[in-house]
Amino acid sequence: MKQITKFLILVGVVSFTSLSQAACSFDVEVGDYLKFSTPDMAVEKSCESITVNLKHTGKLPANIMGHNWVLSADADVQALATEGMSAGLVSNYVPPGDARVLAVTSVIGGGESTSVTFS
């Protein structure tokens, strides 16, 4: 099993770490205060793909308090968060074409939802 743990900067950046509970699909909620509802994710090796469904439960628009969900290795979290801020909203706060980004959702505002499926 692999586990994905969420690390928050201004975007949700996650990385692989130790084990918790297992699943192949995850529902994650985040509001206007950057508090993600799912602190960690454990993925069974048998999962052919993983889906993350992100829902913004707040009221502020994406250009004010937008959120996305990003998967990367632990070692890349800080650099991606910093470089992502420079990339801006137009690039979903991730450097375009960056191989360190393993999966990413689009940035969403209050009341919106998005998802990403990856393997």
What are these regions (language model features)?
Residues 23-49:
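N-terminal edge beta-strand
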Residues 1-8:
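Bacterial N-terminal signal peptides that target proteins for export
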Residues 40-63, 70-71, 114-119:
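Beta-strand cores of secreted/periplasmic/IMS beta-sandwich domains, seen most often
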Residues 34-38, 60-64, 78-80:
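Short, solvent-exposed loop/turn elements at domain surfaces
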Residues 35, 97-119:
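Extracellular/periplasmic metallocenter environments
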Residues 66-99:
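The feature marks short-to-medium sequence segments in extracytoplasmic or secretory-pathway proteins
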Residues 8-16:
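Bacterial N-terminal signal peptides
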Residues 16-22:
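Sec/Tat signal peptide C-region and signal peptidase I cleavage site
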